[in-house]
C-alpha cells in the first residue's frame, strides 16, 4: 500500500509545483521577453542604459529585489491593471486588456524564478 501511494505522490509533484506558483515560468519567460524586457531588462534589473536608445530618466524597479516583497495577488494586480492600481507610477502600463489570466500567472511564475536564480 505504501509504495503505490509514494509513486502517486511523486507523479503529482510537478503539478503541485505548478499549482503553488499559479503559472508556468517557461511560458512566462516568453511573455516577459516580448512585453516587459524593454523597461525591466532581460534579468529584471531594470534598463541597461548602455544598450538602450536615449530615454527619459524614469525609475524602473529592480524586480529581483521587489518581487520577493510582494504577494502573487499584488503582482497580478500591477501587471493586469497597471501601476496606478496599487498607487504606483502611471508609467507601468496595464496588460490585462490583452493578456489572459493564465498569461498573467505565467509571468508572475517567471518573476519568482528570477528571484530564485539570483541567489
Over which residues does each language-model region extend?
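Boundary at the C-terminal end of the N-terminal hydrophobic targeting segment
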Residues: 17-21
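Bacterial N-terminal signal peptides
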Residues: 4-15
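Extracytoplasmic electron-transfer domains, predominantly the class I c-type cytochrome c fold
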Residues: 54-113
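Periplasmic/extracellular electron-transfer cofactor-ligation site
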Residues: 22-23, 29-59, 80-90, 114-119
Amino acid at each position: 500500500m505504501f509504495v503505490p501511494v509514494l509513486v502517486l505522490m511523486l507523479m503529482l509533484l510537478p503539478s503541485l509545483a505548478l499549482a503553488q506558483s499559479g503559472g508556468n515560468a517557461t511560458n512566462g519567460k516568453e511573455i516577459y521577453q516580448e512585453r516587459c524586457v524593454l523597461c525591466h531588462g532581460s534579468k529584471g534589473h531594470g534598463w541597461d542604459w548602455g544598450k538602450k536608445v536615449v530615454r527619459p530618466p524614469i525609475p524602473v524597479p529592480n524586480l529581483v529585489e521587489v518581487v520577493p516583497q510582494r504577494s502573487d495577488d499584488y503582482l497580478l494586480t500591477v501587471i493586469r491593471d497597471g501601476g496606478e492600481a496599487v498607487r504606483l507610477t502611471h508609467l507601468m502600463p496595464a496588460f490585462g486588456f490583452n493578456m489572459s489570466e493564465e498569461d498573467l500567472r505565467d509571468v508572475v511564475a517567471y518573476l519568482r524564478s528570477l528571484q530564485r536564480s539570483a541567489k
